[in-house]
Regions:
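A short beta-loop-alpha structural element at the N-terminal edge
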Residues: 2-18
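Conserved GNAT-fold acetyl-CoA-binding loop/helix
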Residues: 3, 23-45
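A short helix-loop-beta-strand connector motif used in the catalytic cores of GNAT acetyltransferases and
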Residues: 43-57, 78
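Conserved beta-strand in the GNAT
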Residues: 57, 63-71, 78-83
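Conserved acetyl-CoA-binding loop-helix of GNAT-fold acetyltransferases
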Residues: 84, 90-103, 126, 130
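Conserved GNAT acetyl-CoA-binding A-motif
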Residues: 105-117
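Conserved beta-strand-loop-alpha-helix junction that forms the acyl-donor binding cleft
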Residues: 115-124, 146
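Terminal substrate-recognition subdomain of acyl/acetyltransferases
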Residues: 130, 134, 139-163
């Protein structure tokens, strides 16, 4: 059975390694090699909790196996991050966590959750598509970071973007 609960400070030591691994995974989508930094993961969680972001954790058999962070811009609910331990994937953990985000959105009268997604994150895109999330809502544009190596081009309609 999967248990979903609102995160408290006491869970930081057990969830921080997952946050650190999530950041490594995101960097890998950009071709950047990184290593988990649990102290940064703990700091990130503290920032979320201090800012009042709803953070949910998942447990199976009493052990933490995933987390989800929401940001609320009333009435919109954004999923900032969703991570499940690799050995627990495809077992309903992400779905159970995401249901909590959708319930939070419903509590504000909304029928959708907004998701920031890397364009080459096929795993989360497939997950969201299966849940009916198929509308490209917006594109985030920024200047390249100093030293950033942009290796791909992505076309949306007539526009070509570096990635």
């Amino acid at each position: 059975m999967i248990e979903i609960e609102r995160m408290t400070d006491t869970a930081i030591p057990e969830i921080a390694p997952m946050v650190a691994q999530f950041r490594v995974t995101l960097k890998a989508f950009k071709g950047i090699t990184a290593f988990p930094n649990e102290a940064e993961g703990a700091s990130e969680l503290r920032e979320y909790l201090d800012a009042g972001f709803p953070v949910f954790t998942a447990r199976k058999d009493g052990a933490y196996c995933g987390y989800l962070v929401c940001r609320v811009d009333e009435p919109c609910v954004w999923v900032e991050s969703l991570y499940v331990l690799p050995e627990q994937r495809r077992q309903g953990v992400a779905s159970a966590l995401f249901c909590r985000a959708e319930a939070l959105a419903a509590s504000y009268g909304e029928d959708t959750v907004y998701n920031y997604v890397h364009p080459n994150n096929d795993g989360i895109i497939g997950f969201l598509n299966a849940r009916g999330y198929t509308v490209l809502n917006l594109i985030e544009l920024r200047k390249p970071y100093a030293g950033e190596k942009l290796t791909q081009k992505i076309q949306v309609n007539e526009n070509l973007f570096d990635y």
